[in-house]
């Protein structure tokens, strides 16, 4: 059992895409709210456990005006509000934090993932694995029927 830990909450915006990143909290029970009057679509949050035993979560959404989006988190009967991160317009890949509610955060850097996974390849792999599973199941069934026939006839 761990001590209760208050989460750190960040909003990351890129065009119409918004991500609410919630880091290092315990216990797992949490409610993440992305608030905007111009919502296009919103996804359920994904929660993972870190090696330290604390939890991290992210909630994604698409909004007409990403600047109108705020993120608030309810954890342990307390509400935590976000710190905004906006992409700089210069040539570096660093992210510049925008200070809100007297919260100061050090500069963070975001790096794009090196491996790009295409949806078509993932779907094809899933179908291939499903096909192999079906072939295996048929093989086991035929083997069972032939074995049963041998013993009972």
From Swiss-Prot:
Residues 85-102 have a biased composition (Basic and acidic residues). GO terms for biological process: adaptive immune response; gamma-delta T cell activation; T cell receptor signaling pathway. The chain crosses the membrane at residues 130-152. This is T cell receptor delta constant. CDD domains: IgC_TCR_delta. Keywords: Adaptive immunity, Cell membrane, Disulfide bond, Glycoprotein, Immunity, Membrane, Receptor, T cell receptor, Transmembrane, Transmembrane helix. The gene is TRDC. One of its GO terms (cellular component) is gamma-delta T cell receptor complex. Constant region of T cell receptor (TR) delta chain that participates in the antigen recognition. Gamma-delta TRs recognize a variety of self and foreign non-peptide antigens frequently expressed at the epithelial boundaries between the host and external environment, including endogenous lipids presented by MH-like protein CD1D and phosphoantigens presented by butyrophilin-like molecule BTN3A1. Upon antigen recognition induces rapid, innate-like immune responses involved in pathogen clearance and tissue repair. It comes from Homo sapiens.
């Amino acid at each position: 059992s761990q001590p209760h830990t208050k989460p750190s909450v960040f909003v990351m915006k890129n065009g119409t895409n918004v991500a609410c990143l919630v880091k290092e909290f315990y216990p797992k029970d949490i409610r993440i709210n992305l608030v905007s009057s111009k919502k296009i679509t919103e996804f359920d949050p994904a929660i993972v456990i870190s090696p330290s035993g604390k939890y991290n979560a992210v909630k994604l959404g698409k909004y007409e005006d990403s600047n109108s989006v705020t993120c608030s988190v309810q954890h342990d009967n307390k509400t935590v509000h976000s710190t905004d991160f906006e992409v700089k317009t210069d040539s570096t890949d660093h992210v510049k934090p925008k200070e809100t509610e007297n919260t100061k955060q050090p500069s963070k850097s975001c790096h794009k993932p090196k491996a790009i996974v295409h949806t078509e390849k993932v779907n094809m792999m899933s179908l291939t694995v499903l096909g192999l599973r079906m072939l295996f199941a048929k093989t086991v069934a035929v083997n069972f029927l032939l074995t049963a026939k041998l013993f009972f006839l």
